[in-house]
């Protein structure tokens, strides 16, 4: 069997391989950070990793020199990025012996911010994002059905269970993202894993509201979608796994576009 991909983002902070996890963070590129200076780009990459749960609450970031080397920048550039995250409450930094930067925020996007992001995106852009997401997820699901072993499938089941037991919107957002990342891990593809983290970092804050009253994607629907994907993977049915993943992504894309249109039409009526 093919060597399994390192399970980035689906392990807990206590058993994660820190170096490889932060190496993945350094590979992230997001549209929202395009055109920004390097410090702002790094800040956005770290913010994305926090948003999808790749870096967990209370986790210590690597030493500045080590982290700067991961990103291929000078320590001063990294410090500017960390200062931005610190100012916005994502991390706290303790100086001196035994100090360092610790994640102190789960990357919650407020309902006002989420609505602003959805309103400012065009229908075509949201559809394009959905197309990218479903191309990645369907490939991951198909390959997971072909390549995954019992350990991979058990990990996916645990991720699906974590989503089902999540009660807060931010926990659901992170659990949904981790399930998607878990698919890529089960597909045994590091490149798919990197691509999944990137697209989830962009989509998850648009889908999962911080206020349950503003939720645009049904929790029960996502739970059913996850179950259908997992069942097909366990059966080794590549076609069914691919189809189930496509349906899940179509549900997500439809939710984003419908909410965008409601927001735009609401503005035009006011």
Predicted segments — roles?
Residues 1-139, 263:
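Short linear motifs at protein or domain termini
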Residues 7-9, 14, 180, 201-270:
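C-terminal all-alpha effector/ligand-binding and dimerization domain
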Residues 31, 38, 44, 49, ...:
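Short leucine-rich amphipathic alpha-helices used at interfaces
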Residues 51, 55, 145, 234:
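Short, locally clustered residues in the helix-turn-helix/winged-helix DNA-binding domain
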Residues 56-57, 68, 119, 143, ...:
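Short, flexible active-site loop motifs that bind/organize anionic cofactors or intermediates
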Residues 66, 101, 149, 156, ...:
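Sparse recognition of residues in long alpha-helices and their boundaries
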Residues 129, 133-209, 225-228, 240-254:
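Conserved amphipathic alpha-helical segments that form helical-bundle/coiled-coil interaction surfaces
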């Amino acid at each position: 069997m093919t060597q399994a991909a390192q399970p980035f983002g689906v392990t807990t902070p206590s058993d994660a391989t820190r170096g490889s996890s932060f190496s993945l963070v350094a590979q992230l590129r997001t549209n929202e950070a395009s055109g920004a200076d390097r410090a702002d780009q790094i800040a956005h990459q770290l913010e994305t990793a926090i948003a999808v749960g790749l870096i967990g609450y209370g986790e210590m970031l690597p030493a500045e020199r080590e982290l700067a080397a991961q990103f291929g920048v000078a320590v001063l550039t990294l410090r500017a990025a960390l200062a931005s995250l610190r100012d916005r409450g994502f991390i706290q930094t303790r100086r001196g012996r035994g100090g360092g930067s610790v994640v102190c925020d789960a990357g919650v996007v407020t309902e006002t911010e989420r609505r602003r992001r959805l309103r400012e995106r065009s229908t075509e852009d949201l559809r394009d994002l959905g197309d990218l997401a479903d191309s990645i997820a369907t490939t991951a699901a198909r390959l997971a059905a072909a390549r995954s072993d019992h350990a991979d499938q058990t990990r996916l089941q645990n991720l699906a269970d974590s989503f089902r037991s999540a009660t807060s919107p931010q926990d659901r957002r992170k659990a949904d993202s981790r399930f998607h990342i878990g698919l890529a891990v089960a597909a045994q593809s590091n490149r798919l894993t990197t691509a999944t983290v990137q697209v989830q970092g962009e989509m998850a804050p648009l889908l999962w509201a911080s206020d349950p009253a503003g939720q645009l994607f049904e929790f029960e629907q996502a739970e059913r979608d996850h179950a259908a994907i997992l069942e097909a993977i366990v059966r080794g049915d590549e076609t069914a796994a691919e189809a189930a993943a496509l349906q899940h992504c179509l549900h997500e894309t439809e939710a984003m576009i419908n909410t965008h249109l409601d927001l735009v039409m609401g503005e035009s009526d006011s």
